[in-house]
Amino acid sequence: MNIPPYRTRIKFCGMTRVGDVRLASELGVDAVGLIFASGSSRLLTVSAACAIRRTVAPMVNVVALFQNNSADEIHTVVRTVRPTLLQFHGKEEDAFCRTFNVPYLKAIPMAGAEAKRICTRTLYLKYPNAAGFIFDSHLKGGTGQTFDWSRLPIDLHHPFLLAGGITPENVFDAIAATVPWGVDVSSGIELQPGIKDGDKMRQFVEEVRRADGRRQFGVA
């Protein structure tokens, strides 16, 4: 049995403002996500992403999110933005994802009928080189919609992040129910797409820490 750590990792995704990234770093967030998927309301240009990248504190991961982007686009981001992780939300296959010599996470949509057929063995066969998985409600992410957490594959030995409609109000229950390696939030800490709310960011981190305290010490 895979025993999870007591400290749940936190990723704030869809970051578009330097001030929000600085606050995330101050709050001890483990990773910030920068979106390069065409059509996203949180889409960044490479130059804007580079400006944000320069403000990220040491030991905070920078995750570059793609969805069916071309290899040239991804190579440009890898070379200029220097992400520490890549995150793929499209139809990318393992061979493509590992082309860029950067560890990658694969997002798995969980809200549709396809989710009923997802099993651990299938994930490992399709993405044997994935550093971990992100279970989200929909493929594109950032929808603010949850999914049935009981659909999560069992016996996962790779780290996984829970996403999809996670908010300061439900993240405590989400961690208690699924015991994830980490949680991934975007719309749940926003005033509007790409514009984060400092109070919600703080509350989210506080609720994650409270959930971890309960798991470790049995206190609410």
UniProtKB/Swiss-Prot annotation:
Alphabetically ordered keywords of this record: Amino-acid biosynthesis, Aromatic amino acid biosynthesis, Isomerase, Tryptophan biosynthesis
EC number assigned by the record: 5.3.1.24
A single MF term (Gene Ontology): phosphoribosylanthranilate isomerase activity
Catalysed transformations (reactions): N-(5-phospho-beta-D-ribosyl)anthranilate = 1-(2-carboxyphenylamino)-1-deoxy-D-ribulose 5-phosphate
Pathway: Amino-acid biosynthesis; L-tryptophan biosynthesis; L-tryptophan from chorismate: step 3/5
Record GO biological process: L-tryptophan biosynthetic process
Record InterPro entries: Aldolase_TIM (IPR013785), PRAI_dom (IPR001240), RibuloseP-bd_barrel (IPR011060), TrpF_fam (IPR044643)
PANTHER family referenced in this protein's UniProt entry, alphabetically: N-(5'-PHOSPHORIBOSYL)ANTHRANILATE ISOMERASE
Similarity remark: Belongs to the TrpF family.
HAMAP family found in the cross-reference section: PRAI (MF_00135)
Name listed for the protein in its UniProt record: N-(5'-phosphoribosyl)anthranilate isomerase
